[in-house]
Amino acid sequence: SAHHWHDVGQALREVKRVLKPGGVIIVMDVMSPGHPVRDVWLQTVEALRDTSHVRNYSSGEWLTLATEAGLVVNQLLTDRLPLEFSSWVTRMRTSEPLVEAIRLYQQSASAEVKAYFELQEDGSFTSDTILFEAHKAV
């Protein structure tokens, strides 16, 4: 849920402060693809679905945020997560006008965006995820 936090850097600094010696933090979240056009598309879809959305960060942004917070990333894994559209919007109780806006936005996406996110006719798509483990820098 880090993509809902207003100050991820501050949150990671607080994690570092309270982390026991030898302790680790594990973070998993939906991730920005890092490419500007794909990033804008994902952030827009996420914000339409859930008004509490702040930002999905790319792997490079996560590494920078962790390093600036005084953490050392031990391991970083990325993956792809298929999202079934109907259950995805239902989980957040997205209003019908916003569901329609998302569908229209999906339909207007470029061929490159549609291919990258594996957009389906029913609105389902695939998003990137990140999982990383970090410890305090010495």
Language-model-detected regions and their locations in the chain:
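Conserved class I S-adenosyl-L-methionine
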Residues: 24-48
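A short, basic/aromatic alpha-helical/loop segment that forms part
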Residues: 5, 56, 125-127
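Histidine- and/or cysteine-centered catalytic micro-motif in compact active-site loops
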Residues: 1, 30-31, 79
